[in-house]
């Protein structure tokens, strides 16, 4: 699996997803339901592209990355 993508591409992709998320919440969907669907969509796409084992290996690293604050949007980075 690719280790990195250009920061601009990641930022743009995240912006598209967050815009769709905001629209879904506005339409009345529960954020937990959106999150579950987003995780399923992301993982199923990655499995189709890379296979189950590489995706499972990537997912096994998620707890440490979460605890390190990598997914905390409110954090300040310098």
Region locations from a protein language model:
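Solvent-exposed interaction surfaces and binding hotspots enriched for charged
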Residues: 1-78
């Amino acid at each position: 699996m690719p280790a990195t993508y250009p920061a601009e591409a990641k930022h743009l992709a995240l912006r598209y997803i967050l815009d769709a998320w905001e629209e879904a919440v506005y339409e009345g969907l529960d954020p937990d339901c959106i999150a579950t669907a987003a995780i399923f969509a992301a993982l199923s796409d990655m499995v189709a592209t890379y296979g189950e084992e590489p995706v499972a290996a990537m997912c096994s690293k998620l707890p440490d990355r979460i605890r390190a604050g990598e997914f905390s949007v409110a954090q300040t980075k310098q």
